[in-house]
Amino acid sequence: MEFLGGLNEAQKAAFTTAADRWVKVIVGDLPDVSVNGRIIDDLLIRAEGTSIDGPGVILGQAGPGLLRPPGGPGEFLPATGIMSFDTDDLASMQTKGTLVDVITHEMGHVIGLITSPARKKGLVKGIGGDNPVFRGQQAQEEYRKLRDADELKPVPVENEGEPGTRDAHWREKVFANELMTGFVKQAPNPLSRLTVGGLQDLGYVVDLDAADDYSLPSLLALAEEGELRTHIAPIDVGIVLPTIPTVLPSDSLVTAA
């Protein structure tokens, strides 16, 4: 983590807690890359608080910045990322107790779930259609286990909401409070084996056993409780804008001496 400013100590601690959570499931190293003469080891995330538009509407912007070059180790996996949040929204999330889970969720997008790295690797199909899906082998296997089924099926990706929500998350109506669905709720928002399996499909070395306990929700129970609804953000929640990353040239990879 590299803090650029605009964050209080509690907010910095939330970013560190989120990074530590992902480090527990991603256990392998990525090849070093050289960026403007600086060696990047694994992933450099720059985080900041800044004034955007006051509470709600635009929470900020988060996602990969520079991707590793194609054809080599760590193909299309991020080398840098940015997490820039509106200071008013940071304060609001801190008060509501959702700050750590929101930052952990957005950090998942920086890492590549289900953003540009997944798309460049051909893992997301049906983008913009009625039924987008994630076709990574390990994620499909974890989805099979969750369904207690014999056959593999592609993992449903969000098919409702605005750009940045649809086609970029696990489907809310299927997975409810899983961390990488489109809306982070009050805790718990488990980081499941499905998400860790998606990381493995991206090319990360992972520890599936470090995932949180999670099971598919009872959709009937959710509907009866009034919790099953279309994927529209509450007006006071706001959105996080995606980034448009750049792929590094092949000579950015640092070879071992």
Cite the ranges covered by each PLM segment.
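Extracellular zinc-dependent metalloprotease catalytic-domain scaffold
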Residues: M1-T104, H109-A257
